Every structure is written in C-alpha cells, then in structure tokens.
Amino acid sequence: MSSADDHCALAFQYLDDDRLSDSEACFRRALAADPDHLLARTQLADLLLSLGRWEEAWPLNRVYDGKPRPDAPPVPFPEWRGQSLAGKSILIWPRFGLGDQIMFARYFPILRAMGAQVTLIVLPMFGNVFDGLDCNVVHAADELFIPPQDYWVYSALNPNRLNQSLATVPANLPFLRTTPLVCDLPPGPKVGIAWRGNPVHANDADRTFARSNFQALEGLGAAIIPLDYEVSGATTLAQTADLISKMDLVISVDTSTVHLAGTLNKPCWVLLPKHRTDWRWLRDRSDTPWYPSLKLYRQTARGDWGTVMAQVVADLRAKLAKAM
C-alpha cells in the first residue's frame, strides 16, 4: 500500500472507534501524500458533512471538475457544475438511492428560480409520485426520448453545486402525488413499519434488521402495518406513499420509506445504525433539518438494536397513552 493508503486505513479505524478528530487528521495526511486519493477525498467529505461542516466538504467531492466524469449518463450535453442557469435547460438524471431522489427534489424550485427549465427522469418504480412537481417529468421506459438540454446533473449533487449549508436547507418539501392502494386496514391507531432497504447498499448489513425486531411493538394498542412492498402489495412508491398517508406513525430503518414519510410530513421514527451512519443524519442529535416530522433513534453500540427498540417501545407506549 502507498503512504496515502496507510493513512486512509488508519482513518477508518479511528472512525469506527468514534475518534473523529484523529480520523479527520489521518484522511488529511492521506491527501497530503496524494491529493488525488479518491477514497480519502470522498470519505473526508462524508465525515465533514456528518459534522455539519458542509462548506469544507463540498470542494472535496468535486473530484471530476475539469475532467470527464466516468459515471456520466449517456447524453451528449455537459454536466452542470454551478454555471448560470438563466435561460438554460437542465436534466435531472436518476442515480444513487431512491430516498436520495425524493430528498433532493426540494432543490428543483431553486434551479427554476435561477432561470432554468427543469426536466426530471423518473424510474418506473416511482410511479406518478413526482408528477405534481413544477418541472417536466419524463417517465423512463425502454425507449427513452430525452429532449436536448444545456446541462445534466444528478439530483444528489445539487446541494453541492448550490453550496448549501445547514442554515440553508430548503424548508419546503416537494409535493408528492400518491396512487391509491386497495387494502383492508383495521380501525384504531396504525403504525407502519419498514425493516430493510436496498440489499446492495454498502452499509446494508448494519442499517437493515430482522422483521422480528418489531414484534416488541405488538400488544401496545396499535395495529402494526408492514410497508415493505413485498408484504404490502404496493408496486410503486406512489402506492407506498398512499399507505403511509393512512398511518398515524411510521417506524423505519434508514430507507426510502423514511423520505416518503418525511416529505408527507408524517411522524416517523428513524432507526439508525452506529456503524457508518449516513452523513445526512449528522451526529448526536435526534432531529434533522431535512424533515421536521422525523425523530432519530441511534444505536449506541454496533449491532445493538435491542436498546434502540426498548426506547422505541417506551416512547410508543407513552404516545399511545396520549391517544396519538
């Protein structure tokens, strides 16, 4: 391994031990040894983002500025990298997680306010959930026609290109359109649950847990409703959004269900892993600037969902006692 690789490996060890200052220092030493070390740049950026130091983080993530991006979509027009959008058109290309595409849709009005005509490519599994947005919505199909544009951008890169900070996270939540899901729901309080996300996610083993963990919620006085599409019968996120809208509360691991609930302003308790928590949830806080209706429950030890669920059970019992 190179010297930069050695520093990077040590930075990860410190990160896993919550020695954040030491981890940051090692990532910086890796970059001093090799300024183009991709892993050190992106991981230091994630660490800084999780600490709320976004202005320091964004430049580190601009690793392809000034050169072709190897993961660029198959379109003939250039990537948007912060240029003026007055009188321009821009294509939002789908990439990263489903939740990312929901969460970062709040930036489309900013692009429009900058003078852009915005076109959004929507994957089939979203259904019509984005059809109410104030932009051109193109549903992806086998034969996808993309009108000529001035620029393209990944939705998740908009906070970076717009130089966002914690103080400037847009409070406006995008309007989501729902598609009715025919199902029989019991009377009384209803709690929707989601216990798994994308199985190919790099941190899936830590952020997903067994459905049996939710057995602790039974017998508290609320009907427990699975939101997982393989159980609920939903075939699109628009149908899942409809089901969520009928819940009194959602309890979910870190997956797209959280973003649907948050955008619908539905109370949602998010169960977060100790290991490699996503930067968007920041650190050591139970709220989030992204969604006012969310409450965060964090593991205090890697793999310990029992302590998390004990707190969830206590809070749900208290909530039900107040008749939700």
Protein language model features and the residues they cover:
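Catalytic machinery of carbohydrate-active enzymes
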Residues: 1-324
